[in-house]
């Protein structure tokens, strides 16, 4: 966003000064945006850093972290860094997070459960009722992290919203980021919100000065651009749905579409064929994730797709 770029440039001019370690202005801006209290919000060097901090405050050697798979690739890495044991749980046959299976995977050693919604890389969402049924059986001593990195691209109404569930459940913390819809991936800033006790614990293990002055300025300015954000995400959503229909991908609520493949080799071959056409997609063992941005780039992808499939 132009206002964010200008604010970051101004902040960069004072790069000889340390940033506000408490990110006070940013936290208050996020709290106002979410209609929460400042003590319910923590910021970090991207939401991925906050994921790592969640593992730090909940786990030690021998503890378990449960998460859907395939999902955000860093979840098992975060667990291992803390000495915890990753417990991946397969998705359903229709590429959705399997909440009953996640609940069944919880043991007395489980300290943290990640739920990525929309899920990365499949773009699928969970529904409100199944999340409440899931929470009804999750022990109150187990923390549930609702990872909403792609929240701004969601258009379905029947999916849990972090701002609602963290009020209803003290053992839920939600995560969002400025990297995706706001376009600030390069400056690294994300946020967590929920129970003030959880937020206080996150702050205790945060790296000092982890969110730069440039990142803080860009994030604050971005929050003021609600109309521009909606316009940007609406275009992405429209193009996402167009691409999904054109290639037969499954419906998505993120800024990408997921095309399942029968084999790892098929996914790798498809990614290479598209790369040869100047289009980069992400191959996984189970399929290909195709990021969608604007109309021009979607057209470029579809032209490359048609050249290798027709």
Protein language model regions, located:
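Active-site pre-lysine segment of PLP-dependent enzymes
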Residues: 80, 97-108, 121-144, 148-184
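PLP-dependent aminotransferase-like
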Residues: 16, 24, 57-115
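Conserved PLP-binding catalytic core of the aspartate aminotransferase-like
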Residues: 237, 241-277, 286-288, 292-296
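PLP-dependent aminotransferase class I/II
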Residues: 4, 22, 171-250
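N-terminal small-domain helix-loop-helix segment of the aminotransferase-like
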Residues: 1-48, 53
